[in-house]
Amino acid sequence: MSITAETAKAHAHDPAVLCCRAEAGITIEPANLEDPAIFDDLVDSGLLNLDGCLTIEEVLGAKLTKTCDSLCPLTDDVLDGVKAPTTPAEEKAEEEAPAEEAAPAAPVATAATVAGGTLKIHIGEGKDINLEIPVGALGTTGEAVAEVPAAVAATATAEAPVEEEKVVGTLTRRHIKITDVQRGPETKIEGTTLYIREGIEAEVIADQELVKDFHLEIITPDQYHTYSETIMDVQPIATKEGDAILGEGATRVLDGVVMMLTGTDEGGVQIGEFGSSEGYLDENIMWGRPGCPDKGEIFIKGNIVVQEKTNMERRGPMAAHTAFDIITQEIREVMKELDDSFIVEDEELKSIRRPGKKKVVIVKEIMGQGAMHDNFILPVEPVGILGARANVDLGNVPVCVSPLEVLDGCIHALTCIGPASKEMSRHYWREPLVLEALHDEEVDLCGVVFVGSPQINAEKYYVSRRVGHTVEMMDVDGAFVTTEGFGNNHIDFASHIEQIGMRGIPVVGLSFCAVQGALVVGNKYMQYMVDNNKSESGIENEVLGCNTLCQEEGIRALAMLKAAMAGEEVKAAEKKWNPNVKSTNVELIEAACGKKIELVDNEQSLPMSQKRKEKYD
């Protein structure tokens, strides 16, 4: 792809290579040259040899003496009028500061009354400060200004008072402990045992025309080595108290148990794309990830079979999630009726605004391509169905929410992308970047913006422009852009970063990249990037949650954004994925903060599955 004059200037000392076939006799312009950003890969693959290649600054304005094909390096033998190379400008040495002297008297300011009754004061030293004060406000037509020592003048302006932190929202999670799950004649909670009504399966099947079969299992820790179809979602079991709405008031949540949805279509095809996590549960779950189960938890696992060939259509996964929520909602209704004796802990979350600190926003890109790629936003109940809107139906445009709405289950994730980088519903309930930013006293988190990733490129750029304007209106000092998955959604992921960056706002991007998810698009604003990869080989290994955003990425991203907002240098990444970059950055942050960063395990800590053995390891 050809470059612009601006790019040519920025890459003046990089190799000059034709982007397209060029006829003899033309004068070389930026439009004739290829973007140097792609050269490393071409050289590595043997498609490009840069030996003897001139630089961009040398060839601009020169005459091509021979017709050349695309990707032809420009050398002396095909050009006439090559310019002499220049040395890259070196940084100027800092000027030595003059010795501090006693503060001299400030020069006498001149004052004059002008037509219209305005007093003009001009101070010639410093930055040519001009003050205009209505004479009437002074009660005089102008007086000589007394000479004031400069040191005194410098302190004349009173310091602006520092505004105090302000709590703009509180959310209380009320924890109910569950140690056992059984089937019984009715859904109820007795002590620490949850009973699920026998026969509820028939209602799940009857609720949705596309649901053809449903099987409910209770998986206890001693049954983790049980075969399962691909895991579509992991969900907390939570409900609002009284009239409280999402993100406010009190939310009751069951500890020790999660909902797990799995499924196929009638033909046995997994409901997933670019990988699936079917197999033994203990071999295919990355325990403790924000979106995954924790070891020791009980799974209420529902396996749904949808109509054949609807697994890749929008209606198939939607029907599966909607039907499965019948069970969760019945549990929610029981939770609402429990008295406070069942509450074992109250956890208070606060949304705090910090005036005077750097204001930041988190932009989270979620899937919105249609088919199986969709999400429900802002249901009535945490991670519920009722009242929610699909982001595809909303046009994938930005939706602004509070941090507490995120942590209260405002996203019901329908997405069936590759398991390793999929952010499940529970991920948002425990969203690590939101939690890190909320608790960091050095930044002012103003909110979270969810934006869908459309399928069509024109729609992607339309949505990205909305993101840019939304963030600009917030008047923030910095932004994060995160995404799950990789591939098609990286087009708008890069565009979001560009739209924010071009408005002068430093922005840090977070995504699974590494080897398999390496970005195929980019722009000059993508200079601050954090890779979510944790897999040994840098790939989508089909282990649930392996390469999702964790606390360690939240810490690294915050450190990088702070550096960017302060104007500090952030070194460019190496041209190939190198896991040592992450470890080096972690060590630097630990040294600066004096605090150990706990890194999570990867798939090597799990028993080896047959799939991993055959396909990956």
Regions found by a protein language model. Give the residues of each.
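Membrane-embedded hairpin module used as a gating/binding unit in multi-pass transport
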Residues: 356-452
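Gly/Ser/Thr-rich loops at beta-strand to alpha-helix junctions
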Residues: 367-369, 482-492, 513-516
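Long, compositionally biased, glycine/small-hydrophobic-enriched stretches that function as flexible linkers
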Residues: 1-391, 561-617
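Extended, charge-rich low-complexity interaction segments
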Residues: 534-567
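Glycine-rich, charge-decorated loop segments at or immediately adjacent to ligand/cofactor-binding or catalytic sites
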Residues: 514-532
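Short Gly/Thr/Asp-enriched flexible loops that form oxyanion-binding sites at enzyme active sites
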Residues: 489-501
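A general structural motif
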Residues: 430, 454-468
